[in-house]
């Protein structure tokens, strides 16, 4: 077969064509309306965000057709036929081509993976991005049904047994893929005398977030914004988790709350209800665009049915009764969207619903998560984050649970104490606990994911395509049994006084679950060894224990198969009589029931199957008839086995709540073991003492993340002493790179780890309970929002001021540096003064390079303390400026020099430039300090009363 010519040559040929409408560029351009399908959303809206690589392909087709040549040319295997310029009329379509067109019209937003025999093929315009992404051969042909350059559609293909491997690559690149499977076999067609094309149907549709087979646990969020109210619902299809939230009625607060919501959950898909309020809200649009990694789509709500029409009455009533109108609108939108993926049954388990923000947990705004690098560092990875430091979980459900614990620290003193006591208990040896930990480790080594397996069972049991294998189900039940058996065996040991109350309650609940025979009853119905058979069909046929739990349909087909096999053996006796030779059946190339004879000596009515130079293999007429009947009943047997398995899954799903309780407890124990590992594997960790007062007092504390990244012996420990009674506001100065930011982050992480329930990296600690940590750190603009560095800084300060409580921990880093020196000093002074005198009295750490702010300690000696990060100046004979050695120790007092020249030297700036800068700095230093002190003195003199101070603050806040 000729491979055709390179696409570049095809484009050159097309330029010589008399009719530009028939050129390759024209055909690709004509195809452009269909190419919006390669995102899971339409690209008619400017606000839609799609995968950059996919968007490039779409745009190249849509706007600059010739550029697609360079896009496809990247794959050396991609070719286009040499008759690209042909103007011949289209021939009559093949039935398969027409089937593709019909399916494409029904699913225009999907790339179709169509099963044809033992391959999955991508036809027409779908083949263009698929061949490029997978780097596979592109077979030339028509791209759309309007084309007439070839007899058939272009295509590329992948083996059916590797479909899901390739699917992951396509989904990662932003495609939405519909899998079209052959839903009837050749054997059944022949037995039932079916004619015509094989029946094919869309059996699954996937996007990155809805691909739960090998998914990464992505979230899908739906947001409804009605102008006066806003709400969101987020689902995690691979676990069944549903997270709901209603936001403030005032727009600024609602946007801030939505930003925090999205920062915590980091959805890969965001669906926005498309209404007038949404269209008119530019701030909402800009906020959503700032989440660049998420696919954003706008869906009209008037096309969605009410929730009462989408769910069973009792479940719909639960949502309507317990949730707001905006929340139920989001649920209806998500049910409609997920129905295409056969995942809409996620909402039939109301026990999986949870509120995002409750008064039981510390509030961590999005800026705090980002600044403190809780889950993601500045490079976008996990290493070097607080979660990375704490995560020693063994199981996947334990890891997800720990993420919740870290994102939602406790604020109830008793609950925190329970976790701390549990960790202390786990650090003391107990044989029963040791055995239980071994089981959890084994579950982790097996890479089992109980939550994912259970939700896959739920989807399949409620009408979705089969998403779970028999082996996965049996392994899940066996692991459940290992937990239950261990708890039952050691139930008296788990009541030991050395085990904390929290652990005792967990093991007590497990013992209660172990007392029911659910797991053993389910396992008694199957043959465990069957799932380890190599052939999938053997697994299916031998899965059930038919002696103890008979299935009439399966038994009927097995009897029919047995009779046919006996008939075939009886026929063999007759064959031996006919040919008068001691022959036996043989199997060659998966073709059974063959009779091999030398040469071509078989009877003429025998069907010749295969031959070699010396042997011919036959299937006699009656054997052929019996074999076809056997194949038919074998197919029917598999159908019966699949139906019985579906019933079995429904029985498991009927105990969903029971298994969810079991999974939750095991995940929580895994989390406690993880915190124990953090607390005990590091030297110098101690159990904090909880205080009812707002305070953090820690002896020789360290930044846990930095210490973990470096050698413990190299880390410099510091005391922390900040409290409501004294030193409520710390003003911290010091040289650049001297450790100021690391220190204030350390304070925040100490507070967080305490309320997560973990031991702390210090010799001893007394810590109060905070309801929120508010952080303003870093210098960056926000181009998408049209905000300068200073605007971002002021906006974040404004949010902090509005969010303050009397239990807040506030961290502000170099406020005022985004503007001129005079304005910067004035704003920094006014904001810190506001926090000092604010009746809500938050604990505050304020980093600054304005040494003139030191006067605030003089005016508020009880509340304010000046500190700096220690250093040493080292004079050098060959340079005018001193070198600086950082000591990283926190000391009392103020530093008037930031030692920026030392940073310039470390960065490799030439010495002659630094020398000149030093001379200029020395000349300016005194003038600036005099000016700052004069300005500060004037401000202090003008503050004759608290009223005048509030006027100043009001001016600053209004400016913000």
From Swiss-Prot:
<dbReference type="Pfam" id="PF00488">
    <property type="entry name" value="MutS_V"/>
</dbReference>
<comment type="similarity">
    <text>Belongs to the DNA mismatch repair MutS family. MSH3 subfamily.</text>
</comment>
<feature type="region of interest" description="Disordered">
    <location>
        <begin position="1"/>
        <end position="35"/>
    </location>
</feature>
<dbReference type="InterPro" id="IPR045076">
    <property type="entry name" value="MutS"/>
</dbReference>
<protein>
    <recommendedName>
        <fullName>DNA mismatch repair protein MSH3</fullName>
    </recommendedName>
</protein>
<feature type="binding site">
    <location>
        <begin position="734"/>
        <end position="741"/>
    </location>
    <ligand>
        <name>ATP</name>
    </ligand>
</feature>
<dbReference type="InterPro" id="IPR017261">
    <property type="entry name" value="DNA_mismatch_repair_MutS/MSH"/>
</dbReference>
<dbReference type="InterPro" id="IPR007695">
    <property type="entry name" value="DNA_mismatch_repair_MutS-lik_N"/>
</dbReference>
<dbReference type="GO" id="GO:0140664">
    <property type="term" value="F:ATP-dependent DNA damage sensor activity"/>
</dbReference>
<dbReference type="GO" id="GO:0000403">
    <property type="term" value="F:Y-form DNA binding"/>
</dbReference>
<dbReference type="GO" id="GO:0000735">
    <property type="term" value="P:removal of nonhomologous ends"/>
</dbReference>
<dbReference type="Pfam" id="PF05192">
    <property type="entry name" value="MutS_III"/>
</dbReference>
<dbReference type="GO" id="GO:0000404">
    <property type="term" value="F:heteroduplex DNA loop binding"/>
</dbReference>
<keyword id="KW-0238">DNA-binding</keyword>
<dbReference type="GO" id="GO:0007131">
    <property type="term" value="P:reciprocal meiotic recombination"/>
</dbReference>
<dbReference type="GO" id="GO:0000710">
    <property type="term" value="P:meiotic mismatch repair"/>
</dbReference>
<feature type="region of interest" description="Mispair-binding domain">
    <location>
        <begin position="87"/>
        <end position="209"/>
    </location>
</feature>
<keyword id="KW-0067">ATP-binding</keyword>
<dbReference type="InterPro" id="IPR027417">
    <property type="entry name" value="P-loop_NTPase"/>
</dbReference>
<dbReference type="InterPro" id="IPR007860">
    <property type="entry name" value="DNA_mmatch_repair_MutS_con_dom"/>
</dbReference>
<dbReference type="GO" id="GO:0043111">
    <property type="term" value="P:replication fork arrest"/>
</dbReference>
<feature type="compositionally biased region" description="Basic and acidic residues">
    <location>
        <begin position="18"/>
        <end position="28"/>
    </location>
</feature>
<dbReference type="GO" id="GO:0035861">
    <property type="term" value="C:site of double-strand break"/>
</dbReference>
<comment type="subunit">
    <text>Heterodimer consisting of MSH2-MSH3 (MutS beta). Forms a ternary complex with MutL alpha (MLH1-PMS1).</text>
</comment>
<dbReference type="InterPro" id="IPR016151">
    <property type="entry name" value="DNA_mismatch_repair_MutS_N"/>
</dbReference>
<dbReference type="GO" id="GO:0000406">
    <property type="term" value="F:double-strand/single-strand DNA junction binding"/>
</dbReference>
<keyword id="KW-0234">DNA repair</keyword>
<dbReference type="GO" id="GO:0007534">
    <property type="term" value="P:gene conversion at mating-type locus"/>
</dbReference>
<dbReference type="Pfam" id="PF05188">
    <property type="entry name" value="MutS_II"/>
</dbReference>
<dbReference type="InterPro" id="IPR007696">
    <property type="entry name" value="DNA_mismatch_repair_MutS_core"/>
</dbReference>
<comment type="function">
    <text>Component of the post-replicative DNA mismatch repair system (MMR). Heterodimerizes with MSH2 to form MutS beta, which binds to DNA mismatches thereby initiating DNA repair. MSH3 provides substrate-binding and substrate specificity to the complex. When bound, the MutS beta heterodimer bends the DNA helix and shields approximately 20 base pairs. Acts mainly to repair insertion-deletion loops (IDLs) from 2 to 13 nucleotides in size, but can also repair base-base and single insertion-deletion mismatches that occur during replication.</text>
</comment>
<keyword id="KW-0547">Nucleotide-binding</keyword>
<dbReference type="InterPro" id="IPR036678">
    <property type="entry name" value="MutS_con_dom_sf"/>
</dbReference>
<feature type="compositionally biased region" description="Basic and acidic residues">
    <location>
        <begin position="56"/>
        <end position="65"/>
    </location>
</feature>
<dbReference type="Pfam" id="PF01624">
    <property type="entry name" value="MutS_I"/>
</dbReference>
<dbReference type="GO" id="GO:0005524">
    <property type="term" value="F:ATP binding"/>
</dbReference>
<dbReference type="GO" id="GO:0043570">
    <property type="term" value="P:maintenance of DNA repeat elements"/>
</dbReference>
<dbReference type="GO" id="GO:0032302">
    <property type="term" value="C:MutSbeta complex"/>
</dbReference>
<keyword id="KW-0227">DNA damage</keyword>
<dbReference type="InterPro" id="IPR036187">
    <property type="entry name" value="DNA_mismatch_repair_MutS_sf"/>
</dbReference>
<feature type="region of interest" description="Disordered">
    <location>
        <begin position="53"/>
        <end position="93"/>
    </location>
</feature>
<dbReference type="InterPro" id="IPR000432">
    <property type="entry name" value="DNA_mismatch_repair_MutS_C"/>
</dbReference>
